[in-house]
Regions:
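Generic detector of well-ordered alpha-helical segments enriched in charged/polar residues
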Residues: 13, 38, 42, 109, ...
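Exposed, interaction-prone assembly regions rather than primary DNA-binding/catalytic cores
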Residues: 88-173
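Generic surface-pattern signal
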Residues: 46, 72, 76, 80, ...
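Surface-exposed alpha-helical segments enriched in charged/polar residues
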Residues: 14, 42, 46, 110, ...
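Glycine-rich loops and low-complexity Gly/Arg-rich segments
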Residues: 75-79, 85-89, 218-220, 324-327
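Short loop/turn segments at strand-loop or loop-helix junctions that form parts
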Residues: 55, 161-165, 196-198
């Protein structure tokens, strides 16, 4: 198979070498032309450059020896006499449990580091640090949905979780071991949860809304299930590239002050105003849990990447009939 530089196949091959095993869903993060990326993926598979791992509810891929040789050949041909840096061949696995875990860790790294250019450390790197420091029970990290940490400019931390299609449970032991790493940080902020589709985000919000209307036992169950409470106030991000600008900007210098100013301006207007500008949904859920008058006017201010989630909420009848949505834009760098 002939691979041309600047083609979708070359981009896909490079990402497969740099990131390692990835879920099929990660193709949506590689450029705006998804159909072209899918076509390139099929060609690379037919050429034997990528190998697919399948199981019910899971599909991932990794670069083969032939694919890695093709990558090296294209890179050396393009740079000829220069001393080109060539990545080592990443490992892939056919073990389904390991494939699910590894591909999600790698997809989160792809999203935060390559796409959003944030300071980020994977859970595997954190696990190795814990082992060097003789922290006990690090093996249970592999059973959790914890995939890494984001650092901001002052090295504050956001723990990151990957919920896949939304139907996930977090392992309490894995959660505790993740907390060991956070204990040495200056401050820990909200959890960031990656979810593949807007529909899956709405599934989680629907469950949380149900739990908020129940008693304390249901709330305890909610914490064990999704680990999203008012105290956590987790940031939910769709893994489709639309949240790239938000991830690049949030928690930078003056971010919180700027958001507070925008919210104050909007909430000064008549009627009820709910804000999603911090990436969190608990303010809206708390309002909906009170079962307000569906005809009452309410204004929801949100970023452009949250519009698809709000659309699904409206389609499912979870938003008040007269709810108006104000959209704010962020430009990716």
């Amino acid at each position: 198979m002939r691979i041309c530089r600047n083609s979708a196949a070359w981009l896909l091959l490079q990402v497969s070498v740099v990131c390692g095993q990835l879920p099929y869903h990660a193709l949506k993060l590689l450029g705006s032309n998804y159909a072209r990326t899918q076509d390139a993926f099929q060609k690379l598979c037919r050429a034997g450059y990528l190998e697919v791992v399948k199981a019910p509810g899971h599909k991932s891929y990794f670069v083969t020896d032939a694919g890695f040789e093709a990558y090296c050949w294209v890179l050396q041909k393009a740079r000829r006499k220069s001393n080109a840096f060539i990545w080592g061949k990443p490992t892939g696995t056919h073990n389904i449990e390991k494939a699910v875990r590894l591909s999600r860790i790698n997809e989160a790294w792809l999203f935060f580091v390559l796409l959003c250019r944030r300071k980020y450390q994977t859970s595997l790197q954190i696990k190795r640090e814990q082992e060097r420091k003789a922290v006990r029970s690090t093996d249970s990290l592999k059973y959790s949905r914890f995939v890494g940490c984001i650092y901001n400019e002052e090295r504050f931390i956001h723990p990151v979780y990957h919920f896949g299609n939304g139907n996930q449970r977090l392992n309490p032991n894995g959660e505790k071991n993740a907390a060991v790493r956070l204990a040495g940080a200056m401050m820990s902020f909200e959890k960031v949860i990656l979810i593949e589709t807007p529909e899956a985000i709405v599934d989680i919000l629907d469950y949380l809304l149900w739990a908020l209307k129940k008693d304390s036992h249901a709330l305890r169950h909610m914490r064990l299930n999704f680990h999203i409470t008012w105290e956590d106030n987790a940031i939910l991000l769709p893994l489709d590239g639309s949240a790239q600008a938000f991830v690049q900007h949030f928690d930078r210098k003056d971010w919180r002050a700027g958001i507070a100013q925008m919210e104050e301006q909007e909430k000064g207007k008549a009627g009820i105003t709910l804000s999603l500008l911090r990436g969190q949904w608990m303010e809206l859920l708390e309002y909906l849990a009170r079962e307000p008058d569906p005809e009452a006017p309410v204004r929801i201010i949100a970023w452009n990447f949250q519009q698809s989630v709000l659309r699904v909420l409206r389609e499912r009848g979870m938003l008040p009939t007269k709810a108006r949505i104000g959209m704010c834009l962020l430009q990716a760098e």
